């Protein structure tokens, strides 16, 4: 098992300077480009990179400031790169004997993440799972079309209330319909349920195909 801390250290100590110099942060892309519907940038790489999934951990702080596109003018510009794994946590444990198993969730966890992008479960200090990273991804995708309804809100409880009560169709009114299906699937998940990555990946591919965006 590769430890999240080791990944974070290696990236921060050896390559952070290169990311800052050569890799435009997604936040910078958002501030300079409003993506026309139905053409959100292919963020699927963030979640479905097979290496990321196989590590058995969740990031817990996915946000535009922790995601960078490849160097401008290169083929890597089409791909997104995740960094800053300082808050990552394993959800799979390796016992001394026997197969890997899921870590038992804590009844109450410390808040980890960013208020704008974290899930309702994170606001409520529940144990984060794979679905919580996907909620972060969804909010990032929505923000590519414009500000989130709570973008200018600073009070934590109010942000949580807006996320809990907002109608998904209202939140996604300027987004491709596939993102509504994406969101509906997330509402069926919990800590133990494995997300249907094939379904979610296919939904994002459909968005890309509708916008005539090549995956590779």
Each PLM stretch: what is its role?
Residues 174-185:
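Conserved C-terminal C-lobe helix
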Residues 187-215:
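Terminal C-lobe "cap" of eukaryotic-type protein kinase domains
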Residues 35-36, 52-75:
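Catalytic-loop of the protein kinase fold
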Residues 67-112:
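Activation segment/activation loop of eukaryotic-type protein kinase catalytic domains
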Residues 1-40:
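Conserved structural core of kinase catalytic domains
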Residues 72, 114-116, 120-176:
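Conserved C-lobe activation region of Hanks-type protein kinase-like domains
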Residues 29, 49-52:
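Conserved hydrophobic alpha-helix
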């Amino acid at each position: 098992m590769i430890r999240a801390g080791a990944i974070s250290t290696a990236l921060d100590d050896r390559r952070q300077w290169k990311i800052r110099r050569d890799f435009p942060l997604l936040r910078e892309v958002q501030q300079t480009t409003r993506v026309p519907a139905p053409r959100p940038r292919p963020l699927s790489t963030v979640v479905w990179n097979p290496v990321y999934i196989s590590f058995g951990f969740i990031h817990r702080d996915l946000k535009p400031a922790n995601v960078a596109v490849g160097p401008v003018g290169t083929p890597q510009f089409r791909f997104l790169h995740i960094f800053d794994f300082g808050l990552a946590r394993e959800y799979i444990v390796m016992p001394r004997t026997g197969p890997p198993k899921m870590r038992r969730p804590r009844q109450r966890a410390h808040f980890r993440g960013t208020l704008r992008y974290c899930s309702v479960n994170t606001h409520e200090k529940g144990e984060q799972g794979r679905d919580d990273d996907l909620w972060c991804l969804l909010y990032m995708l929505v923000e590519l079309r414009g500000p989130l309804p709570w973008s200018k809100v600073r009070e934590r409880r109010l942000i949580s209330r807006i996320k809990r009560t907002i109608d998904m169709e209202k939140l996604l009114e300027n987004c491709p319909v596939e993102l509504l299906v994406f969101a509906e699937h997330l509402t069926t998940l919990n800590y133990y349920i494995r997300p249907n990555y094939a379904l979610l990946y296919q939904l994002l591919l459909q968005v890309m195909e509708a916008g005539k965006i090549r995956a590779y």
